[in-house]
Amino acid sequence: MNITILSGGTGTPKLIQGFKEIIPNEDISVIVNTGEDTYIGDIYLSPDIDTVLYTFSDLINDETWYGLKGDTFICHEQLKKFGFDEVLKIGDKDRALKMHKASSLKNGVPMSEIVDIERKSLSLKSKIYPMSNERVESKVLIEENNEKILLKFHDFWIFRKGNAKVLDIFYENSNYAKAADGVIKAIEESDFILIGPSNPITSIGPILSISEIKNALKEKLVFAVSPIVGENPVSGPAGTLMNAKGYPVSAVGVYEYYKDIVDVLVLDNSDINKKKDINCEVLYANTIMKTIDDKITLARNILDYYKSR
């Protein structure tokens, strides 16, 4: 059995932790959001790619869901002495990965090749693909003091902590971007696709904004796990961003966002009253993943439902 997972943010990596315990890792492919990627000085941040790499290698700092557990911060502290105070605290080993990306990109190496080098360096059996080798940037249009300002998502979330009146979200360059090498083949060869419980707008939306990928998904069986329980996102700015795009902050809003491609929507048990407004199959489960057992159970519920169809 082969499955392909669409991932971004922190919700989907938690579910990946469950899947990698119950199926052979070589049967898992992951297509990862790169809409939040950005340069900071001489390093290249690709937060969602790095989180997936660290998740599969059991190195992820699962308290912050960013960077490596047990990392040191010697470089970060030294930069502070020079008056360069990084808003995002980057560990030394994590910085090396980001330096590798920056150097490779400047030398013309495609992102898909860079990620594969890093994957192999960590001895990972699962395939990990950036959504595109071309830059597609998530931009957030905000209003501040009656002025409209267009921000990179990184600036909106890291520097401003999401504290702004959001008017809209755009995926810059998505009209021209192509799927990265291996992405379409992974989709076509999968038994089913899983959209993880990530922010639909800025974690999954950039992937779907590439028409080549979205069209390929329409030909496959697609599961999607709602990242919203009741009327509250499990984490992050999903509520604010869904409102800005005109979707209700609920499982119904998640369905409306994915309705062109989703066949089975996975909802939390507490959202049983939402079924009447959802026009696809619904699987109810505990989608709040606090422990490894929660993650494994949710992964197994999805797998069992697929096998029973």
From Swiss-Prot:
It catalyses: (2S)-lactyl-2-diphospho-5'-guanosine + 7,8-didemethyl-8-hydroxy-5-deazariboflavin = oxidized coenzyme F420-0 + GMP + H(+). GO terms for biological process: F420-0 metabolic process. CDD domains: CofD_like (cd07186). 7,8-didemethyl-8-hydroxy-5-deazariboflavin binds at D50, K89. Its EC number is 2.7.8.28. Keywords: Magnesium, Transferase. Pathway: Cofactor biosynthesis; coenzyme F420 biosynthesis. InterPro entries: CofD, CofD-like_dom_sf, FbiA/CofD. Homodimer. Catalyzes the transfer of the 2-phospholactate moiety from (2S)-lactyl-2-diphospho-5'-guanosine to 7,8-didemethyl-8-hydroxy-5-deazariboflavin (FO) with the formation of oxidized coenzyme F420-0 and GMP. Belongs to the CofD family. This is 2-phospho-L-lactate transferase. It comes from Methanococcus maripaludis (strain C5 / ATCC BAA-1333). The lineage of its organism: Archaea, Methanobacteriati, Methanobacteriota, Methanomada group, Methanococci.
